[in-house]
Amino acid sequence: MHYARTFETRGAYQFGSVNRVMLHASGPWAGGTVGLHVMGSAELLTLGARGAPQLLQVAFHADGGTVTDHVHPSPWLMELAGSYDAVLSEDLSISLYAAAIGEPALGPPVYLHRGSAAANPVVPLAHHLQDDTHSSYGVVTYGMRWPGLDLEVSAFNDRQPEEVGPVFFYDGARLDATAGRATIHAGKEWKVFGTYGYTPATTGGHAHDAQHRLGLGALHDAEPWSLSVIYGANNPVGAEGPRHSVLAEAQWNSPTGDALFTRVEYVQRTADELALVGSISAIQDIESMQIGYSRAVAVRGKVMGRLGGYVTVNLTPPQLTPFYGTSVPFGTAVYGEVTLVGRSVR
């Protein structure tokens, strides 16, 4: 459960719950390992269709209107997928991933699965420039792994419903978006990745022109620290150039389960994404800084209870000041969290 509050002209407040349940099962089959992956959420009930307050997040449709400065709720089902992994030789293994709803090989690991954001309940502002394809309605991915190198290619459907709500959405579905990702394992603690994808023009939720997406990043995981530095850009076909984003986030974990987390972002927003079309320049440069702390207050077996909070401070250009009432709009939240077997419900 959380109490979230954003301030100034576009501020809002909410009592609600950010929550997710992830289930994974695996077993031997046909000389390899077959897996089932399911992830769901009840945020449409616990947050409502308008989601949670978050300044400068991408506007979306809900209840027949446009919602600004909120993050949309997660859909009922975010992943329903099967996988197959097999070792072909001492130096080569392969994988096949097929999903009715799932994540293609585009961008970094989605923020939900990064160690550097494990205790952070906030969706990055750069989400729509880096990893927003994580719940695509139709994905097929083939991967090959050598010591120190992973290569993956995906075909997927990038169309989304007009509003969050349908469990499945396949109107006009085609696997006509493509993506590839290369990941270098620099020792046991560092991963460096590069990614490219092409998505055709879509309507509905997350509507966009045909575009290319580029991404680069490095991830470090070694207790007590996890760190991610990520660059992502969308380059619409026919545009003057790409829109850029840079994210750096880190988390420190104490031996008792406490966590200190932080995130710094630079994002280029379009006027359309802020629902301010015609009144400001087409592209706006935004910076955001966040710091938070999560304290373990109870541990019983594999269940851990936490209390946490965070503060987010944003820096906006002068053209946005009349709409936000300040050049430094900010927000804060306090929350209680229950974690079960390494997964969390907030």
Summary of predicted features, one role per range:
Residues 291, 326-346:
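Outer-membrane beta-barrel "beta-signal"
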Residues 1-83, 87, 331-333, 337-339:
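Beta-barrel outer-membrane channel/assembly domains of diderm bacteria
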Residues 30-36, 90-94, 104, 144, ...:
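Repeated loop/turn-to-beta-strand initiation elements of outer-membrane beta-barrel proteins
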Residues 146, 150, 154, 173, ...:
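Detector for outer-membrane/organellar transmembrane beta-barrel domains
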Residues 14-21, 74-80, 134-140, 145-147, ...:
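Residues that define the transmembrane beta-barrel architecture of outer-membrane proteins
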Residues 25-29, 84-86, 143-146, 184-186, ...:
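Residue-level signature of outer-membrane beta-barrel architecture
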Residues 1-5, 36-42, 96-100, 155-157, ...:
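Transmembrane beta-barrel strands of outer-membrane/channel proteins
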Residues 6, 48-183:
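Surface-exposed coil loops of outer-membrane beta-barrel proteins
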